[in-house]
Amino acid sequence: MTSIPEFMTTKHRECDEIFTDAEAAVAKADWSLAITKWQSFALELTQHFSQEEDVLFPKFEQATGMTAGPTQVMRMEHQQMRALVQDLDNALAAQDKDEYLGLSETLMVMMQQHNMKEEMMLYPMMAQNIADGEQVIAQFQVS
């Protein structure tokens, strides 16, 4: 079975790859491809946040009693990223290459820092504290 750190880190890499593909399409002004890649990225990101916020974070908080700790910080960062995603949506809709590329750089840095915190600290803590973690991941893989 796949562990929480393994599965969620792989999802980070998959999101990063799609994000980079969208950015490359915008840089070439291939707006049709950019929209397709961006929509795919946004869907993956939304699903990833949902898996964390609706399932993993509550399970971790219940297991540890920590509700004002790392999961609260991650939720706040998710909100910041959601706001940037909305700004990127607007830049893409306007076919504003410079605005999109500037915002995408900001989002990429934010995602890298965020992912590092999850991968180095939170996911290993989840693996230690969520008793049915592998079963939860198996459910994610099916859906």
Roles of regions detected by a PLM:
Residues 1-143:
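Small-residue-biased structural context
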